[in-house]
């Protein structure tokens, strides 16, 4: 009997911890929302935002909203930080989505002399940049923010000319962890996959 009470108490404590640390699930877009999608080339040319818009316009034709792409090919989080006020908040959004990680995580450096040191430097830079980005996002109190975890990198693909960047996907996962942790207290989070 004592063991059952102890297990029940442990289960209760763990559920409080898990629920307290769960990221927020973003709420659906609403009538009149102005949504800006911040990102890199995946946002600029990936068209996922147009699919989201098509879903809303075909399922809820009377729900008018505007959606804008603020994706720029080749951008890393530090590039996005430089343009976030003008390119994103200059459109007076009610919702901002942000995704980054592919360019932040680097490329050919994984095949260099010291990829471990490179990853440490990049993660410091991404973390510092993301903290500054979060301050800007929090200062726009009337705007909901949704973090979208970065896309994965396929380290198994090979051809005669290119060598895969082994370790890149692990770095992307570290960046996604930063985004997910931010979602616990301030924003929503969606995995890209």
What is each stretch, according to the model?
Residues 1-38, 42-65, 78, 90-92:
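N-terminal secretory targeting modules
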Residues 29, 50-63, 75, 79-193:
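Alpha-helical cap/lid subdomain in secreted, periplasmic
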Residues 37-38, 69, 147:
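A structural signal for the hydrophobic beta-strands that form the central parallel beta-sheet
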Residues 41, 72, 102:
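Active-site metal-binding loops of divalent metal-dependent hydrolases
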Residues 68-70, 190:
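Structural signal for short hydrophobic segments within the conserved structured cores
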């Amino acid at each position: 009997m004592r063991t059952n009470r102890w297990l029940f108490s442990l289960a209760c404590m763990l559920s409080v911890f898990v629920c307290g640390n769960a990221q927020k699930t973003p709420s659906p877009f609403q009538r009149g929302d102005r949504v800006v999608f911040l990102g890199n080339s995946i946002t600029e040319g990936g068209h996922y935002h147009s699919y989201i818009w098509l879903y809303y316009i075909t399922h809820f034709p009377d729900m008018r909203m505007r959606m804008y792409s603020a994706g720029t090919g080749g951008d890393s989080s530090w590039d996005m930080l430089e343009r976030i006020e003008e390119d994103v908040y200059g459109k007076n959004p009610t919702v901002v989505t942000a995704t980054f990680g592919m360019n932040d995580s680097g490329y050919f450096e994984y095949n260099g002399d010291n990829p471990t040191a490179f990853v440490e430097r990049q993660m410091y830079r991404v973390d510092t940049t993301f903290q500054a980005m979060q301050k800007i996002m929090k200062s726009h109190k009337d705007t909901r923010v949704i973090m979208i975890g970065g896309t994965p990198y396929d380290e198994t693909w090979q051809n005669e000319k290119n060598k895969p960047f082994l370790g890149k996907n692990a770095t992307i996962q570290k960046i996604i962890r930063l985004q997910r942790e931010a979602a616990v207290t301030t924003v929503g989070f969606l995995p890209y996959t």
